[in-house]
Amino acid sequence: LIAVVYRYDPPGRKKEFRPWDAKRRKMAPPEPRPLFNQPGLVAAETVVLTEGEKCAQALIGVGVVATTAMHGANAPVDKTDWTPLQGKAVLVWPDRDKPGWEYAMSAAQALLTVGAASCDVLLPPDDKPDGWDAADAISEGFDIQGFIASGPRMCIKPLNTVRSQEATVWATDDALA
């Protein structure tokens, strides 16, 4: 046991999360923050990264290998241990909202930095409501396997792979190509 995240959904209030660090034996997130479902990640070639434990658990419940960072879209990407996803094909399934998209983009770069084999961000359908997520998809009978296999997606490349044109521009004596 690395950590536990207690989720509370008090009536009429925002959901609350309270992490427990098993090693330090206190109510605080561990450093670095572990990914959810680590035993399930070990043998997987492809993993779906969601925005929270509820969505990851819903996907696991229908046979999809899934994980999430502690605190979902509010996760400090730089404090998360992404190394269990090295060498894996990762599909990021964001919630259909601005925080979900921003989290997907920053998590994708972190994944590529630690050596994920590939990283694609699934594009939620345009006709779904704001905030729609993997758990909603499952509850409404959405074709999860079809969406994961061939749904619209954006292939993410590392930011540092932009080729500089400096060598080609300055390779001549007068700097005019």
Stretches found by the model and what they are:
Residues 2, 11-12, 23-26, 43-47, ...:
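TOPRIM fold recognition
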Residues 3-5, 30:
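Short capping micro-motif at the N-terminus of alpha-helices
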Residues 7-21:
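Short, surface-exposed, low-complexity cationic segments
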Residues 18-19, 47-49, 177:
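Short, conserved beta-strand segments within well-ordered enzyme catalytic domains
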Residues 19-33:
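Short N-terminal or domain-adjacent regulatory/targeting segments
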Residues 32-43:
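A short acidic-Thr-Gly-centered motif at the start of a beta-strand
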Residues 155-177:
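The Walker A/P-loop phosphate-binding site
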